[in-house]
Amino acid sequence: MDAKTFDKSKLPSRHVTVGPERAPHRSYYYAMGLTEEEINQPFVGVATCWNEAAPCNIALMRQAQSVKKGVKAAAGTPREFCTITVTDGIAMGHQGMKSSLASRDVIADSVELTMRGHCYDALVGLAGCDKSLPGMMMSMVRLNVPSVFMYGGSILPGHFKGKDVTVVDVFEAVGQHSAGNMEDEELHALECVACPSAGACGGQFTANTMACVSEAMGLALPGSAGAPAPYESRDEYAEASGRAVMHLLANNIRPRDIVTRKALENAAVIVAATGGSTNGGLHLPAIAHEAGIDFDLMEVAEIFKKTPYITDLKPGGNYVAKDLHEAGGVSMVLKVLLDGGYLHGDCLTVTGQSLADNLKDVKFNPDQKVVYPLSNPLSPTGGVVGLQGSLAPDGAIVKVAGMEKDHLRFSGPARCFDSEEECFEAVDKRQYKEGEVLVIRYEGPKGGPGMREMLSTTAALYGQGMGDKVALITDGRFSGGTRGFCIGHVGPEAAVGGPIALIEDGDIITIDAENGTIDLEVDEAVLEKRRANWKPRETMYASGALWKYAQLVGTARKGAVTHPGGKAEKHVYADI
């Protein structure tokens, strides 16, 4: 079908543009300067998570204008709108982080409502910060209109004392400062240069992890995840994304044609191979849920276990997203994995071609140091590992990228904290001991509510030189920037009476990341007595968005989702 001869009678926008009964609706479009020809064309939502909260999303509005050019060039009518985003770098370390994960689902919901309310026919979604990427992808799969995802790009690295630095170096410097190893002046000098441009955090933290996922899963154009936010080449990708969505619309290629079980498995492979964020284990099940596909944390973890870790990126490694882009980009990583038999090459992508077709001309660059060949991986198994055992019957997850093999097992006495603030205060004052397992609980999806990330605490531990001398477990989450023996997503969470709620100070906890186990060394009879005496805790959120989230949210194992998902739906928006 030619883009200029769309049959409006089969598109959602017919409900707001076609027939005499829609004259009032058309009058609004004329008020905004649209011509009759533009009103008769397909309407394409161009959704951005732009805001001025942080550098992560500040470049999205610029790139959205290029997307609109591409849509117009392909005979579509772009309709730009913004949704919210909560930026983790600003929300970190205080009550604001409770809003972070909840924002993912609000983003998906708000994009859905905007598309439904205005009957847009297709969608290009631009996102730059941790939860905005999966939130935007979730909305695409939920709506199932032809869609293209566009990452806003990463920040450029800062430079301090001759080394590249990121915002995580600043978080870790707080720990050095509290340990008396950094003066106020040095900390201030670092904070002033760590983040020199627009863009999301530069290491293989959550934003760049999910950007890699967007390419591996096929929702983004090849190469679009790589270029840093300030680069003008991003605008070329943006314009191409606008053209691409019109091609998808013309050929009726929808997100659920692309986001299949195989595509999700490809996404899990890229997370593991790049030493990506543990949040990938939360967001992939949530994206799958929108398509009605069962793909939980432990299934994701099985793929992590079988995938070699081949990309030397911070926080476990040495390089940042800009370096990966210059080395050959996500496409080169995918090509290495495809040639090694780790990817399903027959998966459809937004180019209209298969993943293998997209990668057929990509060559490995031997003159770079970021991506390793499969013959010499950084580790034979992925940089992220799933755990299961008596402490976490529903599973848990740990990032092992950059950890030495002899540090993959830890056993020690528990030290329990019922909030992140309690633990951070103890860490900041050095009121803990080497060899302890620090337990932060009641921070799960329901119990927080909001499943906060613990970067402030883990970075402080690392900055104090204790990152490999203690372990930390939580029913909350960890930032993609976390390093050290930090286990998150422990389920069932404390708020529903999971084993983590029954731990007492001094109980021995044993974690074996090599074999994928996490156990509480306490007799079952003792645990039964504790369980009988356990009472649910009330949160301080008795109304508002976080109260609503706590009522709806499910388990971390299944992605902490807030609605029944694709399996339960009786109609899909794209078919109205």
Curated annotation (Swiss-Prot):
<feature type="binding site">
    <location>
        <position position="56"/>
    </location>
    <ligand>
        <name>[2Fe-2S] cluster</name>
    </ligand>
</feature>
<keyword id="KW-0460">Magnesium</keyword>
<keyword id="KW-0456">Lyase</keyword>
<dbReference type="InterPro" id="IPR042096">
    <property type="entry name" value="Dihydro-acid_dehy_C"/>
</dbReference>
<dbReference type="GO" id="GO:0009099">
    <property type="term" value="P:L-valine biosynthetic process"/>
</dbReference>
<feature type="binding site">
    <location>
        <position position="201"/>
    </location>
    <ligand>
        <name>[2Fe-2S] cluster</name>
    </ligand>
</feature>
<dbReference type="InterPro" id="IPR050165">
    <property type="entry name" value="DHAD_IlvD/Edd"/>
</dbReference>
<dbReference type="GO" id="GO:0009097">
    <property type="term" value="P:isoleucine biosynthetic process"/>
</dbReference>
<feature type="binding site" description="via carbamate group">
    <location>
        <position position="131"/>
    </location>
    <ligand>
        <name>Mg(2+)</name>
    </ligand>
</feature>
<feature type="binding site">
    <location>
        <position position="88"/>
    </location>
    <ligand>
        <name>Mg(2+)</name>
    </ligand>
</feature>
<dbReference type="Pfam" id="PF00920">
    <property type="entry name" value="ILVD_EDD_N"/>
</dbReference>
<feature type="active site" description="Proton acceptor">
    <location>
        <position position="479"/>
    </location>
</feature>
<comment type="subunit">
    <text>Homodimer.</text>
</comment>
<dbReference type="GO" id="GO:0004160">
    <property type="term" value="F:dihydroxy-acid dehydratase activity"/>
</dbReference>
<keyword id="KW-0001">2Fe-2S</keyword>
<dbReference type="GO" id="GO:0051537">
    <property type="term" value="F:2 iron, 2 sulfur cluster binding"/>
</dbReference>
<dbReference type="Pfam" id="PF24877">
    <property type="entry name" value="ILV_EDD_C"/>
</dbReference>
<dbReference type="InterPro" id="IPR056740">
    <property type="entry name" value="ILV_EDD_C"/>
</dbReference>
<feature type="binding site">
    <location>
        <position position="130"/>
    </location>
    <ligand>
        <name>Mg(2+)</name>
    </ligand>
</feature>
<keyword id="KW-0100">Branched-chain amino acid biosynthesis</keyword>
<feature type="binding site">
    <location>
        <position position="453"/>
    </location>
    <ligand>
        <name>Mg(2+)</name>
    </ligand>
</feature>
<protein>
    <recommendedName>
        <fullName>Dihydroxy-acid dehydratase</fullName>
        <ecNumber>4.2.1.9</ecNumber>
    </recommendedName>
</protein>
<comment type="function">
    <text>Functions in the biosynthesis of branched-chain amino acids. Catalyzes the dehydration of (2R,3R)-2,3-dihydroxy-3-methylpentanoate (2,3-dihydroxy-3-methylvalerate) into 2-oxo-3-methylpentanoate (2-oxo-3-methylvalerate) and of (2R)-2,3-dihydroxy-3-methylbutanoate (2,3-dihydroxyisovalerate) into 2-oxo-3-methylbutanoate (2-oxoisovalerate), the penultimate precursor to L-isoleucine and L-valine, respectively.</text>
</comment>
<keyword id="KW-0408">Iron</keyword>
<dbReference type="GO" id="GO:0000287">
    <property type="term" value="F:magnesium ion binding"/>
</dbReference>
<feature type="binding site">
    <location>
        <position position="129"/>
    </location>
    <ligand>
        <name>[2Fe-2S] cluster</name>
    </ligand>
</feature>
<keyword id="KW-0411">Iron-sulfur</keyword>
<keyword id="KW-0479">Metal-binding</keyword>
<feature type="modified residue" description="N6-carboxylysine">
    <location>
        <position position="131"/>
    </location>
</feature>
<comment type="pathway">
    <text>Amino-acid biosynthesis; L-isoleucine biosynthesis; L-isoleucine from 2-oxobutanoate: step 3/4.</text>
</comment>
<comment type="pathway">
    <text>Amino-acid biosynthesis; L-valine biosynthesis; L-valine from pyruvate: step 3/4.</text>
</comment>
<dbReference type="InterPro" id="IPR020558">
    <property type="entry name" value="DiOHA_6PGluconate_deHydtase_CS"/>
</dbReference>
<dbReference type="InterPro" id="IPR000581">
    <property type="entry name" value="ILV_EDD_N"/>
</dbReference>
<dbReference type="InterPro" id="IPR037237">
    <property type="entry name" value="IlvD/EDD_N"/>
</dbReference>
<keyword id="KW-0028">Amino-acid biosynthesis</keyword>
<comment type="similarity">
    <text>Belongs to the IlvD/Edd family.</text>
</comment>
<dbReference type="InterPro" id="IPR004404">
    <property type="entry name" value="DihydroxyA_deHydtase"/>
</dbReference>
